[in-house]
Amino acid sequence: MEDKKIGIPLEGFGEAVRKAAAEGMVLLKNENQMLPITEKDQVALFGRCQMNYYKSGTGSGGAVNTAYTTNLIDGFRRYKNIVLNEELLKVYEAWIQEHPFDDGQGAWASEPWFQKEMPVSLELAKKARETSNKALVVIGRTAGEDKDYAAVEGSYYLTKEEKQLLETVAEVFEDTCVIMNVSNIID
């Protein structure tokens, strides 16, 4: 086989992929018209998967080579009118330096379903609320070949840490949105 494009992202598919992604998103609720985010909003991002974005699953689904991936932060920064809470982002960046992404050491289907989440104190959430009017909490999951979802915490169910994160943020922010960064089908 002489096809030299095997293993190389084919040009021209980016727009089709963006369209498929937009059409594949599901909005479950939009209470009080929290969405869309506008230039009037100042956004606090919570959850490590705002940075450590899941782009693929496990097993063969994890063997995805891309020219680049765009995490939530970089996606928001493309829109100059949306203000992110940079102080909170710095806290997450420092924590992630000390708690790097667990890729399962690259072994087949060994990446965990979820990543350890940064504890968010009520004080940190309140500090973020001083300069932000909306909160987005990103929860990440991966699964796939040789590592299907299971009815356990950290896979199909939220972990105790994720529940605590959601409770803390929702206590402080009236407008809180949960974004599920999942690498495949989940309900």
Task: Please describe what each predicted stretch is.
Residues 1-187:
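C-terminal non-catalytic regions of proteins with extracellular/luminal or membrane-system context
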